[in-house]
Design a protein with these regions (language model features):
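Short, flexible loop/turn motifs enriched in small residues
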Residues: 31-35
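Residue-level signal for inorganic ion chemistry
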Residues: 21, 37, 90, 97, ...
Length: 169
């Protein structure tokens, strides 16, 4: 497998892509799902190849997107792609991205920040295992960009009243 370097992303590109992922999350919420959104971005850093909102507790946006990508694109191409997601990938999603051979992830808010919003909500028992730790246990140099302060408030706004009454102090 190839581990060719990625085309750099500008901060403006990162912010634009995260805002688009947040629109996917907004649509997921409008459908009654949890407000998470993910994009698969082509090696050019601009072209969005796929969008995915959260499906359910087991089919997170990032995992569904990574599995679909692995079925439709060759691994060396996926290594050059970027998975953009509103919240830091959980251990399941990071693992799925790793096995799909998607070489970079960009996320808006940390899993720890998400946990402060979800608290002990039964529908989202959020873990506290940073994706950098998951990737560090593997053999592939997955690039991680995040959190991104410029979009944190926008992403948090979709979650704030979703999990009300279940916050950690």
């Amino acid at each position: 497998m190839s581990f060719a370097p990625h085309t750099p992303l500008s901060q403006d590109q990162i912010i634009t892509l995260l805002r688009r992922a947040n629109e996917v999350a907004r649509r997921a919420r409008a459908l009654g799902r949890h407000p998470f959104g993910a994009l698969l971005v082509a090696p050019d850093g601009h072209t969005v190849l796929a969008e995915q909102g959260n499906v359910d507790t087991v089919n997170h946006a990032e995992s569904v997107l990574a599995r679909t990508a692995a079925l439709n694109y060759p691994p060396d191409y996926l290594w050059q792609c970027t998975l953009v997601t509103t919240a830091e990938p959980c251990a399941m999603c990071a693992g799925t991205q790793y096995w799909a051979h998607i070489g970079r992830v960009v996320y808006g808010i940390t899993e720890e920040r998400l946990l402060s919003l979800t608290g002990d909500h039964a529908e989202n028992p959020t873990m506290n295992l940073p994706c950098r730790e998951v990737f560090a246990r593997g053999q592939k140099p997955v690039e991680v960009i995040g959190p991104v302060a410029e979009v944190e408030d926008e992403i948090v706004a979709l979650h704030r009243d979703m999990w009300s009454g279940h916050h950690h102090a």
